[in-house]
Amino acid sequence: MPVSFFSGRAAAGAGRKRMENVKDIIVIGIAGGTGSGKTTITQKLQAHFGSDVTVLYHDNYYKPHHDLTLEERSKLNYDHPDAFDTGLMVRDLRELKRGHSIECPVYDYTIHDRTRSTLHIVPSRVIVVEGILIFQSKELRDLMDIKIFVDTDADVRILRRIQRDVKERGRSLDSVINQYLTTVKPMHEAFVEPSKKFADIIIPEGGRNQVAIDMVIGRVQAHLDRRA
């Protein structure tokens, strides 16, 4: 979740020492529609594994549009695969898997643009990659050991999105609804929902499905125990 109104999503893992045994690293991809509960699952993994978890948010890899005005940026389609610099995320994830630190871009939702600052991120034993369209790229998928799709009813997702964008991102209700109808919903149907076929695990109802979350935690713990 956003650590501040300015910095968007902060990638967990900043400030720790370099990972020495890179064979220990497991990468978990968590995809699903907007408001599906992806971040809730990510937070539960963080709560269980603590400092063993580093998180990369696809949102931080939105392409920069410094050449456009705020009004122009607000009208862009942010739910299409082309909105993301996924190639950069692939390169960054590869570096993390090699045990190297990265400088992660930072996206600011309030200005609809990437900021000039970066986050210094170091790898950990569990790397979570989270985003609505992370399964669209084969290069990115191939770097994941476990691929999870969070499947939540559309009515629930839009209500969560309205609440989040109005409260946390300074959006108006009208702008959120208009964006949902013109880009979010059609892009979900065209790109997000079809990417579910790439998932190893489908979790209905997101963070409320404790049985499924416990199974994921058990799978990750087994991996860590084997490498201990």
Residue ranges of model-derived segments:
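NTP-dependent small-molecule kinase module
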Residues: 4-5, 16-21, 122-123, 163-166, ...
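P-loop (Walker A) phosphate-binding loop of NTP-binding proteins
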Residues: 33
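Conserved lysine of the Walker
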Residues: 38
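Hydrophobic positions on the alpha1 helix immediately C-terminal to the Walker A/P-loop
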Residues: 41
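Short beta-strand-centered segment that lines the nucleotide-binding/catalytic pocket of NTP-utilizing
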Residues: 51-66
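Conserved nucleotide-sensing/catalytic segment adjacent to the nucleotide-binding pocket
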Residues: 67-109
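ATP-dependent NMP and nucleoside kinases share a basic, alpha-helical "lid"
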Residues: 115-169
